[in-house]
């Protein structure tokens, strides 16, 4: 049986938690970011200069990073839900200046809510 794609109520939930994540990211609300990542050794976040495996590595990165220059504008955001408990979120972003990037997240609904289980952030070469 195939999962139903983008059930309206599930899509609304993931859109809301994605917006909460984005607000926490640009405002450096580390406690919210920590809450929204699955607290597991299996959680993965590949960034522009770091490969983080496990929630402890992700927490250490978030705590140590500079809170300066986190603002960004999102473009071409696509959120897709698969059934009631799985979703992906992909977006492009632009920061002040010319830097541009992309972000992908995999979300799973657990008993305590939606959590990111895998994330990837990369920059786009502006000379293209």
Identify the function of each model-found stretch.
Residues 2-3, 10-13, 48, 56-100:
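Surface-exposed, charged secondary-structure patches
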Residues 1-36, 40, 127-128:
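Short, low-complexity N-terminal intrinsically disordered segments enriched in polar/charged residues
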Residues 17, 29-32, 61-62, 75, ...:
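Hydrophobic alpha-helical segments typical of transmembrane helices
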Residues 88, 100-128:
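Short beta-strand edge/turn micro-motifs at domain boundaries
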Residues 21, 33-34, 42, 54, ...:
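Hydrophobic pocket/interface hotspot
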Residues 37-38, 93-95, 120-123:
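Short beta-strand segments enriched in hydrophobic/aromatic residues
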Residues 24, 51, 97:
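Acidic-and-aromatic substrate-binding clefts and catalytic sites of carbohydrate-active enzymes
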